From Swiss-Prot:
Keyword Transmembrane helix applies: no
Residues annotated as the enzyme's active site: 53
Binding-site residues for NADP(+), renumbered to this chain: 190-195
Catalytic activity from the UniProt record: (S)-4-amino-5-oxopentanoate + tRNA(Glu) + NADP(+) = L-glutamyl-tRNA(Glu) + NADPH + H(+)
Protein's recorded name: Glutamyl-tRNA reductase
Coiled-coil region: none
Family: Belongs to the glutamyl-tRNA reductase family.
InterPro entries with a match to the protein in the record: 4pyrrol_synth_GluRdtase, 4pyrrol_synth_GluRdtase_dimer, 4pyrrol_synth_GluRdtase_N, GluRdtase_CS, GluRdtase_dimer_dom_sf, GluRdtase_N_sf, NAD(P)-bd_dom_sf, Shikm_DH/Glu-tRNA_Rdtase
Marked site positions, Important for activity: 100
GO molecular function terms listed in the Swiss-Prot or TrEMBL record: glutamyl-tRNA reductase activity; NADP binding
Originating species: Saccharolobus solfataricus (strain ATCC 35092 / DSM 1617 / JCM 11322 / P2)
Biochemical pathway: Porphyrin-containing compound metabolism; protoporphyrin-IX biosynthesis; 5-aminolevulinate from L-glutamyl-tRNA(Glu): step 1/2
């Protein structure tokens, strides 16, 4: 591991995904709002939780000991689930954590390869956790870089060409059975985000005879009227009246048999329906992977863009460290300057000099002295941060000199020992 890569070790992730625990089990790992708030009280770290139908991923940043905070979360999960659920987590830190999130943002790790939806999900996640006060500037730059990498991958590769989103795949698989939707009776069960997207796509496909069913009739009505469709109260016994039904509704682990001739496209997690003539998310995943095999040559390009993104993240991180360092030092210098100017004003007043112009000259002169005196030092510090082999150790050592506290969990002992050793050998 290079010294630069060590800088990223303050970032870690705890992962539960459709690849590791299966799409049908993923709902067991979702965090409730109360559990998220409990984490805030438990750990000493910035954190954000990315929860989608494909994954539950916790990202952390701590400037002390991130792995210690990871272990706290895993123990917490074990306690609330009354079983060692944390043992099923995949834990990544440093460059590996960044690479994973960047691949997720690129759509290369999605159930539906190349999907665009994940970018908005990453954006809404970091925005929400920032608003809640659970994430800070270091996790912000981590997620912002992931979003930039995701956009760049889509611009420079063909990973997202064609219909790759999970909703598009669901529509296409249903169309294969009927050629088109023009004269088909279609049912959408649910009125949430997924159902809204399915309904919008059906409208774009020219579907005319569509009915929205939902437990809350008002939500079904609101969605249906938006597209000029019908709506009804949820009644599963009526499924046999339709040619195709798209299912997107929350349920408490129900499993129902498809006893009708209706084609059921069930994108619920876990699936509500089993049996013949049922298409689930797992089936759509298989189709997505087959589609991606035709674009496997894009993987090398994607991996290169991800590696470039990690180097850019390192730059972002160092820039944030430098900005924080400069802010701390300049705040201290400015406090000293202002105090000394006040002393000088008082001395001038003792001499009978109470000229406002003289005070302004004194203010400008001290600012100029500080700028000319410290600029070479600041230039050297910037060079150490962005180019130095032991950049983070030098930063902490300089801050120790100014007695202003550390901004990183990396110890300064190594650099101090090195300096002592060098003096001893003279």
């Amino acid at each position: 591991m290079s010294k630069d890569e060590e800088l990223l070790q303050n970032y870690c992730s705890i992962l539960f995904t459709y690849k590791t625990i299966g799409i049908s089990n993923l709902h067991l790992y979702y965090f409730r709002e109360t559990e998220i708030k409990s984490l805030k009280q438990l750990i000493n770290a910035e954190f954000a939780i990315l929860q989608t139908c494909n994954r539950v991923e916790i990202y952390l940043y701590s400037d002390t000991n991130t792995l210690k905070e990871v272990n706290k979360i895993i123990q917490y999960l074990n306690n609330i689930h009354n079983e060692p659920i944390g043992n099923q987590a995949r834990v990544l830190c440093g460059k590996d954590a960044a690479k994973h999130l960047f691949l997720v943002a690129s759509g290369a790790d999605s159930l539906s390869i190349g999907e665009y939806e994940i970018l908005s999900q990453i954006r809404s996640t970091i925005d929400m956790f920032k608003k809640l006060g659970f994430s800070g500037k270091y996790l912000q730059i981590f997620f912002e870089r992931a979003i930039k990498v995701g956009r760049k991958v889509r611009e420079e590769t063909s990973i997202s060409k064609g219909k790759v989103g999970i909703y598009s795949l669901a529509i296409d698989e249903a169309k294969k059975r009927f050629n088109d939707f023009y004269d088909r009776r279609i049912l959408v069960i649910g009125a949430g985000e997924m159902a809204q997207k399915i309904t919008s796509m059906l409208h774009n496909e020219g579907a005319k005879d569509v009915t929205i069913m939902n437990r809350t009739i008002e939500k079904a009505k609101q969605l249906a009227l938006k597209f000029g469709y019908n709506y009804e109260k949820l009644d599963l016994d009526k499924l046999g009246n339709f040619d195709v039904a798209f299912i997107s509704i929350y349920h408490e682990n129900l499993r129902l048999e498809n006893k009708w001739n209706t084609l059921i496209v069930d994108i619920t997690v876990p699936p509500l329906f089993t049996g013949n003539n049922v298409i689930t998310l797992e089936e759509l995943e298989r189709i997505s992977n087959l589609n991606f095999k035709a674009r496997e040559e894009e993987l090398a390009k994607i991996n290169k863009l991800v590696e470039d993104g990690i180097n850019e993240l390192l730059y972002d991180y160092k820039k944030e460290i430098y900005t924080e360092f400069m802010s701390k030092i300049m705040k201290r210098i400015e406090t000293i300057r202002e105090n000394e100017i006040l002393r000088a004003y008082k001395e001038l007043e003792k001499l009978g000099i109470n000229d406002q112009q003289a005070k302004e000259i004194l203010d400008l002169m001290t600012r100029s002295i500080i700028k000319k005196s410290f600029q070479p030092l600041f230039d050297n510090i910037r060079s150490l941060i962005f180019n130095g082999e032991n950049s983070i150790n030098y930063i902490n050592f300089l801050i120790d000199i100014f007695k202003d506290g550390n901004i990183s969990g990396f110890e300064t002992e190594k650099i101090k020992e090195k300096q002592v050793s060098e003096r001893s050998s003279i």
